[in-house]
Amino acid sequence: MNLTLEKIQQRLMSSDDLKTPLYIADKNDFKRNITDFVAAFRKYYPNYNIGYSFKTNYCKEFINVVKEIGGYAEVVSPKEYQLARNYGFDDSRIIYNGVIPDLGNKIRCAN
């Protein structure tokens, strides 16, 4: 499908069924941006990898791209941890952290 800005605007203005928040993104651009970002860091830090924040946006299409390139799921809650597991991330590919860490949940996730 060839979407232009005009077509997107027409669709948004003529629709009563769209809900918010609404994200308009190109999965190929997203993948290219992440891949380029990782490659730039690996020039200087060969073991670099990326962790994608589920808190920011846990849209499955974005998460699948991160998983496809070997990135990590970065989660801060039991709900996000379970989403990462549901989306196929192994525990070894999940970073569990946060501003106010809950030690009990971290221990449960580690087991």
What are these regions (language model features)?
Residues 1-111:
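A charged N-terminal "starter" segment
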